[in-house]
């Protein structure tokens, strides 16, 4: 039971002049909520009105049509008590609000109950305060959280799960009460999210600007949490990346995992505004050309053939660039990493060509990223489906797998095969004794067959993607490869 001090003797000037004159400010009213009796002034009731209370007591003040009974009615009104069958505990908070105090909300249960009764009593100012509060209140994994809204000030972190929830659930309840003219608000449970409370604490730490030590497993777990809560800026900040400046091409480069790329960040510079290193030219990526290059480099230094070669290959490719959503102001040349054996380099002995075979999850991700995001060229936009093939799975022979067989350049690649560093890639390409594998020949897309060649299965690899004249080429930057079953099992680790 709560009793406020008598304020009938206080003057009109004592009250806030912004309080509307709905009820007499100096008059005291009695309201019993549950088992508790509250005495409250007209000024306090008028401070948040019009409301259920101001309408009720205003009607009681209206004079009766029977003048003889006016005095009796006014006398009875002095002793009248408004009975309300609601929670006295919740009304205690509302009582403090009407008296001008700030309500310190502790958790999601208090917030939900307070919001429901603010609707029930039709308190417009309290409803507005609750909707515009500086915090979100929720329960995650059994632990209550009071989340400051300014943690989501960065672009991409809003709108998020909490903002959308607050903008829909509570507003829907409000509209339901108003439209259906319900006597009381429908029962509504406090928000509960069945996620890890420990991971969410880490997210709050990062949102607040602090840093924490993360291994790969925890980093991936937090990225999943960011996607669940729609914290897109924080997700990008958690994704592993490396930015560097290439002094040869005089361009910035960014390295990311293929699985972490977003279609929104993919861009290509205009052909006229970009000229790459001559070593990215496709002729350098055939077996014959590597052989001729090897011979060329054996020529005396005073020969002019190097200058001629530079002029011959001083053409431009459109290199794939990437701009991280919500973080980067300008795009950088992209190097993407594939961390699985979904990627295989195929060297064809007959056609003297090099392709990279991408399959499995990497193929699906590759298609999702580049299926409709390749730029137009004078020869038309490259079509990824032109490089798509479907073969039976090697394991079951019944499941059909999608393969992307794309022209590749490995001349610049820092290549490690079977644990041995290959210092000169052209020596590998010109050693015909190594070409004993059975590989797919895609020289004629309408007549696929197998031929002799060399397969390099990649454990990890770094790539650039280039486009020119409607064609696509993948440029290997760094790769760890194996060739053969024994070498594959060397990569096994004990449990």
UniProtKB/Swiss-Prot annotation:
UniProt-listed CDD domains: BTB_POZ_KCTD-like
Compartment(s): Cytoplasm; Nucleus
SUPFAM superfamilies in the record: POZ domain
Xref: PANTHER family: BTB/POZ DOMAIN-CONTAINING PROTEIN YLR108C, BTB_POZ DOMAIN-CONTAINING PROTEIN YLR108C
Entry annotated with the keyword Phosphoprotein: no
Organism of origin: Saccharomyces cerevisiae (strain ATCC 204508 / S288c)
Other facts: Present with 172 molecules/cell in log phase SD medium.
Gene Ontology BP terms: protein homooligomerization
Family matches, as Pfam families: BTB_2
Gene3D superfamilies: Potassium Channel Kv1.1, Chain A
UniProtKB keywords: Cytoplasm, Nucleus
The keyword Oxidoreductase is assigned to this record: no
Alphabetized InterPro entries for the sequence: BTB/POZ_dom, SKP1/BTB/POZ_sf, T1-type_BTB
Superkingdom of origin: Eukaryota
Name of the protein in question: Uncharacterized protein YDR132C
A single cellular component GO annotation: cytoplasm
Principal location: cytoplasm
